[in-house]
Amino acid sequence: EPLCVLVKPLCSFERRLLLHECALIEQEAGKGFVMYTFEVEEAELWKDRVGELLAYIENSLIAAIEAHYAHLPLVVGGYSLGGLFALWTTTRTSIFDAVAACSPSLWMQGWEEYYEAHPSKAKYIYMSLGKKEEKTNKMPFKLVGDICRRQHQRHIAEVGEGHCHLQWHEGDHFTDSELRKAKGFAWCITKTTAHTDSTDSTRKTR
C-alpha cells in the first residue's frame, strides 16, 4: 500500500526511463508510493508557462490525487529545470509536504532575489548537485554550486537542519540522473512518512 504520493513534471527525455526511476525509488526508500506525472517540454518549466502549470496542478491534478489518496503526504520533485520548477512550486502553494530539487537550475537569472522574497512553504526540502557541475568556465553554470550552498543555508534558517538536505553526487549534470532523482524522492518519502504507516488513522486530510 502506498504511503506517499510523488508528483513530477515528465520531460520527453525522462519518459523511457521512468519505470527504472520508480524501481530505484522503491529500492532506496523501502516504502510504497504512487507517482503522478504531467508531460511538459523542459523549456516550459520556467517563465512563460509556469503559472499555467501550477494552475493545472492545483485545480486538476491535486483533485485527482485527493479522490484516492487524500490522507497521504505529497512530494513534488524534478531534475534540472524540473528541479527548479518543483522548488518554485513550493513557494506558491503549501499543498506539498516536501520537495526534491535534484540538480536544480538555480543559476537562472533572478532566482535568488525571487526566493529571498518568496521562501518555500514545504516542511522538508532536498537538493542535490553533481560535484563537477560548478567546475566550468561557462556562465552562468559555474555559479550553481555557490548558489546551491546559499540556498541550503536559507533552508536551514527556514525549516531547520533536520528538515533539509543538500547532497553532493559524483559527476556532472548528466551523471546518474535517475539515481539522483530516486535518492531525492526517497529522502522525502522517509521524512514525510517517519511517523506514519499504512494503518495510522491520524494522517492528515487536506
Name the predicted role of every residue range.
Residues K191-R206:
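Intrinsic disorder/low-complexity segments
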